[in-house]
Curated annotation (Swiss-Prot):
Gene this protein is translated from: Iqcc
Organism (species): Mus musculus (Mouse)
Cross-referenced PROSITE patterns: IQ
Keyword tRNA processing: no
Keywords in alphabetical order: Coiled coil
Name of the protein in question: IQ domain-containing protein C
Region (Disordered): 101-142, 230-264, 280-299, 327-355, 376-418
Length: 418
C-alpha cells in the first residue's frame, strides 16, 4: 500500500475522532452553561443560541422578556375566565327570562308590577356585572401572588405584616438618631455654643476666685489684727522699758532688754487670746459701770489685764516690773520719785498710734488706759503739769502723782510706773 494514501486515511480518521470529541465537549459545556443560567435567572426564556457549528449564547433584553412573560401569565387566566363565563352568563340570562315570563303570565292585569320587575332587572344585571368584575380582579391578584411566590394563608400574611412593621420602625429610629447626631454636631460647632461654654467656664472661674479671695481676705484680716496687737503691745512695752542713756540707768537697761525679748515671745503666744479677753472685760465694765463709780471699772480691768499678761509669761522669762503690788492696788494715787523719773525719760514710739509722749522738766507720768471699749489695746499717755504750777504742787513728800480732772478719771485709769 502506498504510504501517502495510508497517511491520508489515518489523518481523516483522526480528524473525525477529533471532531466528534470536540462536538461532544461543546455539548457538555452548553448543558453546564444552561444549568448555571437556570440557577441564576430561574428561566431560560432570555437565553438564545446563535451560530452554526459552534453556537454562541445571547441574552434578550430583560425588561421586554419580563413584560411579555407577565402578559402571558395574566392573559392566560383571563382567557380561561372568559372561556368559562359566557356559558354561565347565558344560562343565568335564560333562567332570568323564564322567571320573568312566569311572572307576567301569573299577573297580566298588574302592569305596575311588570314595570317594577323591568326596573329591577337592569339593577340586578349591573350588580351581576360588578360581582363578575370583582371576582376577576381577585382571581388575577391571586394568580400574580402565586407567580411571585407570596403566601395566601392568614397566619403567613400576619407574620409578613409584623416583619415589615419592625423594619419600618427600625428605619424610623435610625433616621431619628442620625438627625439628633447631626443637630448636636452642628450646635457644638456653632460660635454661639462656644460662647456659652466660655461663659459658663468664666462664671465657674469667677466663683472659685471669689471664694478663694474671701478666704484669703479673712485670713489676712485675722493676721493683720493679731499683728497690730503684737506691734502695739511691743511698741508700748518698748516705750515703757527703753530708758535714756544716763549713767545711773546702765544696769537697768540690760534688764529691760532681756525682759522685753522674753515678753515678745510670750505676747506672740497670748495675742490671740488677749483681744477677746479685753473685749469681754470692756463689755462687763460697760454693763456694771454706774455714774457715780468714776474710774473704778477701768482700774479693775487694768489689774486683770496685767494679771493675764503675767500668767502668760513663763516663770524664767517674767519681767520684774518696777511697779510694786502696793502701787497696783493703789492705782489712782501712786507715789512718784523724782530721781527715778529723771532716770526713765522715754522717747515717743512711732509704731504705737495711741501713745502720746511729752517731755517737760524731767517729770515723767505714764498713764496706761484702755483706748476704748471696743479697742483691746493699751493707751500710754504722758501728761505734764502746766508751767504755772510747780512740779511738786500735785504730789506729796512721798512722790504722789499730779491729779487729773474728774473727766479724765472717768475716761481712763492711770497706771504710774516708777
Amino acid at each position: 500500500m502506498d504510504p501517502d494514501l495510508f497517511l491520508r486515511k489515518v489523518s481523516t480518521l483522526q480528524a473525525g475522532f477529533r471532531g466528534f470529541l470536540v462536538r461532544r465537549q461543546f455539548q457538555s459545556l452548553r448543558a453546564e452553561y444552561e444549568a448555571i443560567v437556570q440557577e441564576i435567572e430561574g428561566d431560560l426564556s432570555t437565553l438564545q443560541w446563535t451560530g452554526g457549528w459552534i453556537p454562541k449564547p445571547v441574552f434578550l433584553p430583560e425588561a421586554k422578556s419580563h413584560q411579555s412573560w407577565k402578559a402571558e401569565k395574566i392573559s392566560n387566566p383571563e382567557q380561561k375566565l372568559w372561556s368559562h363565563s359566557p356559558h354561565k352568563d347565558s344560562e343565568k340570562e335564560l333562567i332570568w327570562e323564564e322567571m320573568v315570563q312566569k311572572k307576567t303570565e301569573k299577573s297580566p292585569a298588574n302592569p305596575g308590577s311588570l314595570c317594577r320587575d323591568d326596573s329591577a332587572w337592569p339593577q340586578a344585571e349591573q350588580g351581576r356585572k360588578a360581582s363578575q368584575g370583582n371576582s376577576q380582579d381577585t382571581s388575577v391578584s391571586k394568580m400574580e401572588n402565586a407567580d411571585l411566590g407570596l403566601s395566601q394563608s392568614q397566619q403567613e400574611l400576619q407574620e409578613q405584616r409584623n416583619h415589615l412593621a419592625m423594619e419600618l420602625l427600625w428605619l424610623q429610629q435610625a433616621i431619628n438618631s442620625r438627625k439628633e447626631y447631626l443637630i448636636l454636631k452642628q450646635t457644638l460647632r456653632s460660635p454661639e455654643a462656644s460662647q456659652t461654654r466660655d461663659k459658663h467656664r468664666g462664671q465657674a472661674y469667677e466663683k472659685t476666685s471669689l471664694h478663694s479671695s474671701c478666704v484669703l481676705d479673712n485670713q489676712s484680716y485675722r493676721d493683720r489684727i493679731i499683728g497690730e496687737s503684737h506691734h502695739a503691745e511691743d511698741s508700748s512695752h518698748k516705750g515703757r522699758l527703753k530708758p535714756q542713756k544716763h549713767p545711773d540707768s546702765v544696769t537697768s537697761a540690760g534688764k529691760t532688754t532681756a525682759g522685753s525679748k522674753g515678753r515678745e515671745l510670750c505676747y506672740r503666744n497670748s495675742a490671740s487670746q488677749l483681744p477677746a479677753a479685753l473685749e469681754s472685760q470692756a463689755g462687763g465694765d460697760r454693763v456694771t459701770k454706774g455714774p457715780d463709780h468714776g474710774g473704778q471699772p477701768f482700774k479693775e480691768t487694768s489689774l486683770q489685764q496685767l494679771k493675764v499678761l503675767e500668767d502668760q509669761i513663763p516663770g524664767d522669762l517674767k519681767f520684774r516690773s518696777p511697779c510694786s503690788r502696793k502701787a497696783e492696788t493703789q492705782l489712782p494715787t501712786l507715789s512718784e520719785n523724782q530721781n527715778i523719773e529723771d532716770r526713765y525719760s522715754r522717747k515717743p514710739s512711732r509704731s504705737a498710734g495711741p501713745c502720746d509722749l511729752n517731755i517737760l522738766e524731767g517729770h515723767m507720768i505714764w498713764d496706761e488706759t484702755l483706748a476704748g471699749q471696743e479697742q483691746g489695746s493699751l493707751d500710754l499717755i504722758r501728761t505734764k503739769p502746766p508751767k504755772s504750777q510747780p512740779p511738786s504742787a500735785g504730789s506729796s513728800g512721798h512722790g504722789n502723782t499730779s491729779e487729773l480732772s474728774p473727766e479724765g478719771w472717768k475716761n481712763r485709769g492711770i497706771l504710774q510706773w516708777r
